[in-house]
Amino acid sequence: PTLKEINLDIYPGERVLIAGPSGCGKSTLAGCINGLNPFSNPGECTGELTVDGVNAPKSSIFELSAHVGTVLQDPDGQFIGLTVGEDIAFALENSCMPQEEMHEITRHAAELVGIQDHLDYAPHELSGGQKQRVSLAGVMVDQVKILLFDEPLANLDPATGKQTIELIDEIQEKTDTTVVIIEHRLEDVLWRDVDRIILMGEGQILADLHPDKLLATSLLEKNGIREPLYLTAMRYAGVEILPEKKPAHVDSVVWDEADRAKVVNWFRHRPAAQAFSQNEPLLEVKNLTFGYEKKQKTLQDVTLTIGKGEMVSIVGKNGAGKSTFSKLVCGFETPDSGEILFQGKD
């Protein structure tokens, strides 16, 4: 079975993070909560599941959607309307709500998530973070009591991910909803407080602890979840991580002078980064320019060289052109101008 003997209580107003490696059953559990499992994805379900007083296995996706609002990792898969406003109002239109009331509720939901100035925009004109806001507004028009986020940071850069977590925090404070976040980017989610972390592995719950208590253990590392980097640095420096040191957030960590001295000493004596020798050029990009539309260039005069045997990371915020650059190098798109040379050949 994908899930085995899950026993879990989530209380009104809580913010709970469900973490675990890929394939551990996080999204399957989310699908049980919102009704996708087993109503949309056939399967056998045993045991009991009550969602906001509703017997979930004997209910329906439609009935559960009035209690649970789900935001998926790929917001593009949730867009229905041709504009932001239409998309937010989709559920209201299905309930045949009068237009005047529908416009008012749509505007209110848009204001809650800070997207009110984009109601006439088409989905493809939005950034990744803005799309997440629209998806969130679309489920909030039903005034659900539970907001379920299934890997909401998967397609977002770190900065936009933090903004998304801040938005979730603000929405919960304003609406007092229960928030369940499915995610393995632990450090980004802990940018704002959570009440509990549910750690899953191989379809089972391995731990159900307050963040300070879980981060003081080695359970995350043992189960393939990267702990916050500041904790890794502290461990390398020989600092003992204890729950009373409040390790859940870098700003809340309690340090004493001995801990500070250990970290400073480790930092000063860590091995220097090795300088890479100049390898023979393998891939050369010269003055590469490309745009999906004539008036707007996604890449402009990009020039770089990657040597044989090098390992290179291309980073940047959403919309910076990383994927477009990869498509051009692979030949999936044709550049407007410039050269791409592989082993000296165009």
Predicted regions and their residues:
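Conserved ABC transporter NBD signature motif
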Residues: 42-54, 338-345
